[in-house]
Amino acid sequence: MASKTLGINQPIPAEASGNKLKQWFDRNYMYLASFFLPVVLVLIAYANFDIYPFGKEGSVLALDLNGQYIYYFEAIRDAFWGDGSFFYNWSRDLSGEFMGIIGYYLASPFTLIPILLPRTMILESIMIMQLCKLGTAGLTFSIYIRKSKNIQPLQSLMFSTAYSMMAYAVIQTIDPMWLDGIVFLPLVALGIEYFIDNGRKINYIIPLAIMFVANFYIGFMIAIFTALYYFYYLFFGTDAKLKVQDYVKKTIIFGFCTVIVLMCSAFMILPVYNALSLGKFEFSGKPDYSFSTQFSPIELLPCLFPNQYYSVNMHGKPEIYCGMITTVLLPLFYMNKEIKWNKKVGYSFLVAVLFFSMYIKPADMMWHGGQTPNWLPYRYSFLMSFVLVSMAVMTFSKLEGLKLTIGKIAGVFIGILALVMYFDAKMPSFNYVKKGNIVYVDTVMTFVFGMILAGIYLVGLFFISKNMKKAKTVNIISGVMTVVISAEACYNALDSFKKIDEEVAYSSRTSYYNEIQAGRDVTDELEKYDSSLYRAEKTFFRCVNDNLAYGLRGISHSSSVMNTKIINFIETMGYSMRSYVTRYDGNTPLADSMLGIKYVIDNNNNSSLLNPDYEPVFSYDYKNQKDEDKTLTVYRNPDALSIGYMIDNSITNLAFLGNDNPFNSQNMLLSTATGNTEFLNQDGSILINGNKEYYTRLDTEISTQQIQVSPYGDQTLYTADADAVDPIINIHFTAQTSDDIYMYLKTQNEKAVNTWISSEKGSDGQFTNHKSLGSGAYFENHNYSIVRVGSFEPGTEIEVRLTVRLNSTEPDKEEYTIIKDFQFYQFHKDLFDEDIALLKQNQWEISDYNDRYIEGTITAEDGQIMLTTIPSEPGWSIKVDGKKVEPVEILKAFIGIPLEPGTHTVTMKYTPPGFNLGVVTLILGIAIIVLIYLKSDKKIIAQLAEQQKKLEEEQQKAQKKAKEKVNKLIKSKGAVANIDIEKMDNKDDNSENPENKNDSEK
C-alpha cells in the first residue's frame, strides 16, 4: 500500500514515528503547544510590563497577592520545610488554625512550585506558578474540546489559547488560587460527558476531588456548575439514546460518584468549613436578599471585547471576555444547521442561568456563599467563558452546517456593529469615566480594535468554509488565525496589567525582598537570643501579614478566614482592628504584657508605637530598597507573661468585655484576673460592684473653631463652616501624674481627622508649636486605636487638636467628623506593676513545644483557673497530668483550663476538626476508586479501545478498497506510466474533510 503524506490533521503511521519518544511527541505536540503558547504570551506581556527578569524592579505582586497571599506562601513554605505546621500558625491574631487558610488559598498542587523553589526567588516562583496554571488551563481545555467536540489539533490551539487567556484568567493572576477553577473545569465537564455517554466514572471523580481540595471557594462554585452541566448534558447534550430508567439510574450513580468526591476531599473540606464557621459565615452580617439588578444587559457587550478591563472593585463588571473569535462565532452557533436543536437549547439554558446569576443580585450572592464579595465581583464568571468558548468550538467544528456566504458574514459583522453603536450611544448614561478607579470603557481600543478583529476572523471563517476539502489551505488559514488570536490575547493581557497597575498598583521586587529578608534575619537572631515560646511584634509594617514571612508570633494579620472572637477581643484591648484586619497599633504595656508580647522590633521611625519602658536588647543593620543603611532594634517587655498563667476564677463571671472603652476593658481584665473585682449575686444575676483602675479618666474641655456642632443620634457631628480655612476641635486636659496619658476616640462613623498636640503656651495664653500626635491622623486606615499621648509633669496643661480635613478638589463639599466619646486616660504604672507581679508568680513554665503542641508545668492555688492567651477554637486536646480535660472559654476569646491546687503538667495538642475523619474517608474513597476502575472503568476502556481498533481497521479497509478502485480505473485507461499514484493517494487523503467528527476518539 502506498505511504501517505503526513498532514497536520492526519493520523501518524507507525513507520513514520521512529522511536517511542517521537511517537509520543507526534501524538501530543499540539497538546504541548496548547500549554506553552499561553505561557509565552503572558511572558511577552510581562516583559513589556517590565516584570522581572525582563525589567529590574517589576513584580507580580498587586492587591491581595501583595498584601495577603504572598505571606501565606511564605508560611506554607516554612511548614513544608519543618519550620512550622500545616495545622496551626502562631503568626496570626495571637495564633490560630492554618488548614483553613491552606484550603482557602494554598492547597493547589501548583503551590509546590513556590514551596520547592528557593525562598530567594519566591516572587519569581509565584510568577512561574501563574504561568503554569494558565498553561495547564490551555492544555486541559485542549483535551476537552478534542475529546468532546472532535475538533482537529491545529484548530484546537486557537480555542485553547482563547480560553486560557480569557479576561478572568489574566486579571485573576492577582488572585492565583482562583485560577485552579479554569484548570480543572474542562476535565470535570469531560468527566460528566464520559459518565453519561459510556459510564466511565473516574474521569469525573478525580478532577472534581482535586478541585475541592485545591480551592474550597472556587470548588463550591464548580460544584453548582457541575449540577447544571450534568442536567444540560443528560437532557440536551448527549447523543446517547437513553430510556427513562437510564435517566434515573445514571442520576443515582452520579450522586454516588459525588459522594466519593466528597470522601476524597473531606480531609480538606471539613477543616476549612470549621475555619469558616469561626467567623467568615457571619462576617458580612445578615445578607440582604432583596431583589435588584446589577447592570443593564447591554453593558455585557464590551465585556466580550478585548481591552475591556473595568475594575477590581465593586463597580467592576463580569470578566467574560474570551477572544473576539468567540464573540463572532456565537451568533453563528444558532445559525448552524449541523448543530442539533437540543444542543442549542441546552447551551442556551447554561448561558441564561449564568447571565441571570450575574444580573440578579440575590442569585449572584448565592454563588458567593450567600454574601456580597468584598471587591473582585462575579468570581464565577469564568464559567460563562467556558460555556461561550465551548459553543464557539462546536460552531467551528461544524462549519459545513453554516454554508457561509458574504451576505451572512456581512450580516454578522453589521449586527455586532449595530450593538456596539447602540452601547456607545447609551454609554454616557452609565456614568463611565476614563481615569481613576471607577469603571470605564475605552471606545477606540475596545470597540474599534474589536471590530477590526471581528472582520479578520469572519473573513478567515469564510475562506475556511469555502476550502473545506483542501486540508493544507484550511491549516494555513487556521495557523494565521491562531497567530492573530495570540496577538490579541497578548495585547489584552498587557492592557489589563497596565490598568490593574493604574487602579491598585503593582509592588516592586526590592520593596518585598529587602524588607522581608531583613525581618527574617532579625527574627532568626531573636530566636538565637531567646528560643522559648513567646510573642513578638513590630512597630513598622510593609503589610499587616509581615509576621507570617518573618516568623514572628504576634497579633497583626489579615485573612478572609478569621476567628471573629479573637479579633473582636483584640479591638476590645484598643489595638487596631478594621474589618478582618488586626494590627499592632494601639499597644499599651498592660495589654502587651497580659497577651505575652515579650519583644518588639522597632525601625527607629515609629517611636509613637514603641513603649518607652521597653528595654533594648540588640540591633540589626541592613540596607533598604533604596540601598540606604537602616537599623532594626529589638526591645524587651520586662512584664510580658507566659502563654498561660493562673488567674482568679472570678473571671468566669465575665461573659465578655465591651468594646466602647478599651481602658475600661483593660481595667476589668487585670482587676478580675488578680481578684480585685467585686461581684454581687442579685436575683440570680451576677453584677459588677467595682474594680481596680489602672487607667483613670481625665477631665476634658472641648472647644471648636470654624465648626458647627450638632447632635447625631448618641454621637456628635462636627461640621466645618462653609468658609472654613482651618476647622479644628481642641481638647484640653491636665496631667495628674508623670505616667503616660492615652487617647481613644470612639465613633460609629469614621471620618478621618489630623491629630496634633501641644503643651506650650504663648504670651497670650494660647497653645503654640503643635506637633503631630501619633501617626498624625485618626479614623484613617489603621489609625482607629489607642494613641499614646505621652508623659508630662503633674499639672501640665495639654491641648490635643483635631483638624477636620477640607477637600481641595471639591471646595464646596461639606466636610465633617463624627465622634461619640473623647477618652483621655492617665495610666498608673505603680498599680500595674503591683498586680502584674502577682500574675508572674504562677506562670506556665513551658518545657517543650512546636507549632501544634505545648507542654509545661504550672502551679495552681485555690480559687484559680489557668488562662491561656490561645484563641478559643475547636481542635485542641488538653491533658492535665496525662488525663484529658475539657477546656472552658474565657471572655469569649481564650482557652481556660480548670486546675486543682498544686503543680501540674499541662499539655495541649492541636488537630484540625474533621481532619482525622477526612483521612479515613480519603483512604476509603481511594479504595472505592480503585475498585471502580478494576470492576467498571477498566472494562469500559477496553471495550472502547476494541471499538476504536475495529473502526480503524474498517477505515483502513475502506481506504485500501478506494485506492484499488482508483488503480483499476487508471490501468483501464492505460495511463499508469504518466500518473504518480502516490500523488493520487495524497490527493485522495487531502480531499477528506478536516472538520469531520471522529466519534471513536471520544
Language model region names:
Residues 39-141, 161-182, 221, 276-283, ...:
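Membrane-interface coil-to-helix junctions
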Residues 218, 345-365, 371-515, 903-952:
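Contiguous transmembrane helix-bundle modules in multi-pass membrane proteins
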Residues 1-52, 249-253, 459, 475-481, ...:
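Start-transfer (signal-anchor) and selected internal transmembrane alpha helices
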Residues 38, 130-148, 153-238, 250-273, ...:
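Membrane-embedded helix bundles of polyisoprenyl
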Residues 484-513, 524-595, 641, 647-651, ...:
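Extracytoplasmic/lumenal acceptor-recognition loop(s) of multi-pass membrane glycoenzymes
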Residues 72, 686, 690-955, 1001:
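Active-site-proximal, structured, solvent-exposed surfaces of multi-pass membrane proteins
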Residues 13-98, 501-504, 509-544, 548, ...:
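Hydrophobic alpha-helical membrane-insertion signals
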Residues 63-76, 109, 250-253, 257-337, ...:
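Periplasmic/ER-lumenal interhelical loops and adjacent helix-loop junctions
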